[in-house]
């Protein structure tokens, strides 16, 4: 890796939206450090990065692991100019049936990990007086959804976190924003039967699912110099499914 090039750190870069973001960043000349929860995922990251960065295994529920991995990156003289919190999980269940572990796992992965990752990189960004912090949220944070009180709480928590953080670091040249996708075409949507497909589609004014590349484009914009005066904002990418 070239220490003179900008570097983006992306969680969950082995597939889906994370991979789409990483590939677009590479085209912009930005190096990528990507994470996955498995060695197989890391191999996939390294294959598509083609030398424009590297991947490594990271368990977002392990606080010590997050801190250690970030410190290792800095010790190797790599910078983290752009932090993209993309990884997230769902463990859906109605509240009356939800186990404590289902609540804890989702909150730790989707919300607490963002706190620990930001805390690990923020001092370096402040010292350089520049940085981008971008997190993938969800339309569910605004609309709610049956069976997802844990997921909704985790994504809603990110909104308040990012607004408060944006106020704390705005004078330091650091922007803090969220990209909030609606229904995006994934392996999940491809498994829907025609009735389920039409039910989901009926909630989207644009009458189609979003593409992961469209979410990635929003992230690329917020990471660019063109978005240098935007902070504490949530950029919705949902085809009109939710409007402020």
From Swiss-Prot:
Task performed by this protein: Catalyzes the NADPH-dependent reduction of beta-ketoacyl-ACP substrates to beta-hydroxyacyl-ACP products, the first reductive step in the elongation cycle of fatty acid biosynthesis.
Self-association state and partner proteins as the record states: Homotetramer.
Record's keyword annotation contains Cell wall biogenesis/degradation: no
Matching InterPro entries: 3oxo_ACP_reduc, NAD(P)-bd_dom_sf, Sc_DH/Rdtase_CS, SDR, SDR_fam
Top enzyme class: oxidoreductase
Miscellaneous comment as given in the Swiss-Prot or TrEMBL entry: Calcium ions stabilize the structure, and may inhibit FabG activity by obstructing access to the active site.
NCBIfam families according to UniProt: 3oxo_ACP_reduc, PRK12826.1-2
Entry keyword set: Calcium, Fatty acid biosynthesis, Fatty acid metabolism, Lipid biosynthesis, Lipid metabolism, Metal-binding, NADP, Oxidoreductase
EC number of this enzyme: 1.1.1.100
Annotated binding of Ca(2+) 2, by residue: 145
PROSITE patterns assigned to the protein according to its UniProt record, in alphabetical order: ADH_SHORT
Cited PANTHER family: 3-OXOACYL-(ACYL-CARRIER-PROTEIN) REDUCTASE, 3-OXOACYL-[ACYL-CARRIER-PROTEIN] REDUCTASE FABG
Protein name: 3-oxoacyl-[acyl-carrier-protein] reductase FabG
